[in-house]
């Protein structure tokens, strides 16, 4: 939900390179001729063919949704970046992290253990390839609850399995099903390798930015165009995908998917109050989605309502109404 923002701040303070503009006195005809020559050059064609082959070879289907996406970043690099992010964040909030003896830690770990058991279960999850599943199982999962109600409500999971939850989000979660909504969403970002997908696209965005700059000579316009048309759109798509996967996970783990709708209603009210944007009628205004990294909350609610019949069916077929479904659940992915 919010993890991608922190991830981006740490590694991509500026997504696109800034280029010095050289002599721009070339006529339009010479400009066109130069590009035509470049495009028909045999070496250029070889390089372009190789890059196209590399792109096609690294197209993979996302779990659950089966969306085709480009990912070339290896697991070890994704984990190393997660380690770097973890050290930065832990150093910043170390004094505010609750001890494992705190009741809230036990509450969060119980929910996460159920979600991880469903997500990493070989007999249940056939959407993840065996190699990636083993990679996820090898991670040292860890929960860090940051006690500071003055901070914005937030939660995220890094690619190395480190989980961060801000105490300010707990009143919005309200109950276990609401908390499961947040945690399953964040876990879904890692199951779908959204961090790797974002990293994989950065070179493409930089190349496009360079090409646009040679045409327009205006870097801010190029940034605006690429952000609005590509970057923001891709981010919203990944957020919606995490919503979808997360809802399926929590339904399989026997949480109530209908509470997800209530959670997003509460989140919507919290966001609007924090923004302080009030309409003339006394209500709150919606932000323009086009330049947002996240879908509008109303859209997220509508999506979950659309998925609800399927989610309830998944929950029923998971044996959630059988006595003792999690009664003997003792497996823990977290070391104390």
UniProtKB/Swiss-Prot annotation:
Zn(2+) binds at residues 185, 189, 239. Its cofactor is Zn(2+). The chain crosses the membrane at residues 155-173. Its EC number is 3.4.24.-. The active site is at 186. GO terms for cellular component: mitochondrial inner membrane. Protease that is part of the quality control system in the inner membrane of mitochondria. Cleaves and thereby promotes the turnover of mistranslated or misfolded membrane protein. Required for TOR signaling. Disulfide bonds join 254-320. It comes from Candida albicans (strain SC5314 / ATCC MYA-2876). Residues 174-336 are mitochondrial intermembrane. Gene3D superfamilies: Metalloproteases ('zincins'), catalytic domain. Protease activity is induced in response to various mitochondrial stress. It comes from the Eukaryota. It is an enzyme of class 3 (hydrolase). It is found in: Mitochondrion inner membrane. Binds 1 zinc ion per subunit. It is a single-pass membrane protein. Residues 17-154 are mitochondrial matrix. This is Mitochondrial metalloendopeptidase OMA1. Belongs to the peptidase M48 family. GO terms for molecular function: metal ion binding; metalloendopeptidase activity. Coiled coil: none annotated. Keywords: Disulfide bond, Hydrolase, Membrane, Metal-binding, Metalloprotease, Mitochondrion, Mitochondrion inner membrane, Protease, Transmembrane, Transmembrane helix, Zinc. The keyword Translocase does not apply. Its main location: mitochondrion.
